[in-house]
């Protein structure tokens, strides 16, 4: 950490969790606010909008926005926060084996770090490896649903002409199939 990942615009529902983790002030200081989402979808060419503050207030929440984060910074912020809350963090480690109990439940891993082999067990084992799918690859055979084998392409643009709400996420359907997600 940090390591490069494509940026992320968080969904507004993440705000209460970020508050529970004590990260709202840090997120507000470091990352761009997203006030809503504008969509251009279906047969109607006119865009429509969902305002995050209105959505939050309808649930009794005090939040007004979500964030667009730089993933490398956000991931490091989450890792450091977990460490400060007492999580034992192992970096530069390689999982070599998944441990299971007699019933087949995953109970831990064997990993190498600094040339030494270690064993870690826990009541809950969480695979936070993202698209790497470390545990999935070791525990199950991946099967793909053929009609959902999609392709994603990403790029950065130097400039654009925003719609009325420049801090919104923009999602637009593309004629003939597909869509794009634009984050300013």
Question: Where do the language-model regions lie?
Answer:
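Short beta-strand to alpha-helix junction loop
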Residues: 58-81
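Conserved acidic
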Residues: 6, 70, 74, 116
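Predominantly flavin-linked oxidoreductase catalytic cores and closely associated redox partners
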Residues: 80-184
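Short beta-strand segments
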Residues: 46-52, 118-120
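A generic secondary-structure micro-motif detector
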Residues: 4, 67-68, 112
